[in-house]
Amino acid sequence: MQTRFTASAPHSAAVTAVAAAVLVTALPAAAQPVPAPQVAARAWMLTDVTSGQVLGGANMDERIEPASLTKLMTAYLVFEAVRDGKLKYDQMITPTETVRSVKTDESRMFLEPGKPVSVRDLTQGLIVQSGNDAALVLAEAVGGTETNFVMLMNREAERLGMKNTHFMNAAGLPDPNHYSTARDLSILTASLIKNFPQDYKFYSQKDFTYNNIKQPNRNRLLWLDPTVDGGKTGHTKSAGYCLVTSANRPLPDVPGASRRLLSVIIGTKSDAVRTQESLKVLN
């Protein structure tokens, strides 16, 4: 079932105007907005990327800890470097001793210092396995140092219009000055999908094996909803369980037409809850 939610107050006038135009052409005349669902999350947002319409949300502009959702920006800059010829997916990178700084309780793809690895494998380790070690090595490959890479992250965030975001590292480790919002993460993900459609396909990959260690994609919706073709999970103790998900949904009563929905769920109590609440919002 496709449901359109009533947007929150700051954007209700603009959303109403856009919604009217969409309803005339895409939905039955009798269709009416329904109240937004109660979502068990600190913040959430649902956007129709196709039209740019905000369909609903709560606390969309509240500063939150993005955790591994940070890696959406890390991937964005890697995709940009590949597009611009600064990196190639078949290029081999040799991890330095800095990968030893990644702690054993952090998500890893299990890189080894001095053992060459391709940019493609690093990208899969970053996206599918959410490897903090992959984030660090890619940051150094693009920026020279992680410090320089973080400068690029913040510059890109400003360029994209992420008005309430500031990064301090490439992996999403907790820091008082490392923050974003549901709205900004929606802007980032929509831009990634639009600007790098081929690279975005990494996000639909259900598992990846590196160093003889197979790890599944942590986005459970890839198995539960056939219209979901990507997204990114995030979790720290302080951030809670977070999930950005995109689904390409057919438009009802419009043969051959579809729209892309993008949900952002921040700060739930468990992996199961973030999955459940994402499904609730998308449906």
Regions found by a protein language model. Give the residues of each.
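Extreme N-terminus of proteins, especially the signal/transit-peptide cleavage junction
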Residues: 8, 12, 29-40, 256-258
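Active-site-adjacent loops and short helices of periplasmic peptidoglycan-processing enzymes
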Residues: 31-183, 191-194
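Bacterial N-terminal signal peptides
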Residues: 13-26
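N-terminal secretory signal peptides that target proteins for export/translocation
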Residues: 1-9
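Domain-terminus/edge residues, biased toward the C-terminal soluble/receptor-binding domains
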Residues: 162-166, 174-283
